[in-house]
């Protein structure tokens, strides 16, 4: 059950990160504080997406709390690296995102996935 909570946490955190990235690119910069505050108070689509992203992170923390009670810490923290993979893929696939493909990033994703497989695949016990 800890793995399920961990996967929920990773997926929710990834969606939250994408939401915050979208909101940050569409809201006025915080260097123009009054424009930024006015955009938040208008509670348009960008402000709502910002709020959903923040609430997503809060929900992700709850799932992470449940994960840490059910899953070994060494496995739980390795699971977090999946968020990098999900956000990278989503940034290239989702419309309006400007993620770019590179062999260097693909190599990084391959390393992350290889590490996760080493940690999570069952091992066979050898008898001596």
Curated annotation (Swiss-Prot):
Topology versus the membrane: Multi-pass membrane protein
Main location, first listed in the record: membrane
Keywords annotated in UniProt: Cell inner membrane, Cell membrane, Lipid A biosynthesis, Lipid biosynthesis, Lipid metabolism, Lipopolysaccharide biosynthesis, Membrane, Transmembrane, Transmembrane helix, Transport
Listed PANTHER family: 4-AMINO-4-DEOXY-L-ARABINOSE-PHOSPHOUNDECAPRENOL FLIPPASE SUBUNIT ARNF-RELATED, SMR FAMILY PROTON-DEPENDENT DRUG EFFLUX TRANSPORTER SUGE
Family: Belongs to the ArnF family.
Job description of the protein: Translocates 4-amino-4-deoxy-L-arabinose-phosphoundecaprenol (alpha-L-Ara4N-phosphoundecaprenol) from the cytoplasmic to the periplasmic side of the inner membrane.
Subunit structure comment from the entry: Heterodimer of ArnE and ArnF.
Protein name per UniProt: Probable 4-amino-4-deoxy-L-arabinose-phosphoundecaprenol flippase subunit ArnF
Organism: Shigella flexneri serotype 5b (strain 8401)
Lineage: Bacteria, Pseudomonadati, Pseudomonadota, Gammaproteobacteria, Enterobacterales
Gene (name only): arnF
């Amino acid at each position: 059950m800890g793995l399920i909570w961990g996967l929920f946490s990773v997926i929710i955190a990834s969606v939250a990160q994408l939401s915050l990235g979208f909101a940050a690119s569409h809201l006025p910069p915080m260097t123009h504080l009054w424009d930024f505050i006015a955009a938040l108070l208008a509670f348009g689509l960008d402000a709502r997406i910002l709020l959903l992203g923040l609430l997503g992170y809060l929900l992700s923390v709850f799932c992470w709390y449940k994960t840490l009670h059910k899953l070994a810490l060494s496995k739980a923290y390795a699971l977090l690296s999946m968020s990098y993979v999900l956000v990278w893929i989503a940034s290239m696939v989702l419309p309006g995102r400007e993620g770019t493909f590179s062999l260097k990033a693909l190599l990084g994703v391959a390393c992350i996935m290889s590490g996760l497989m080493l940690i999570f695949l069952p091992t066979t016990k050898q008898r001596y």
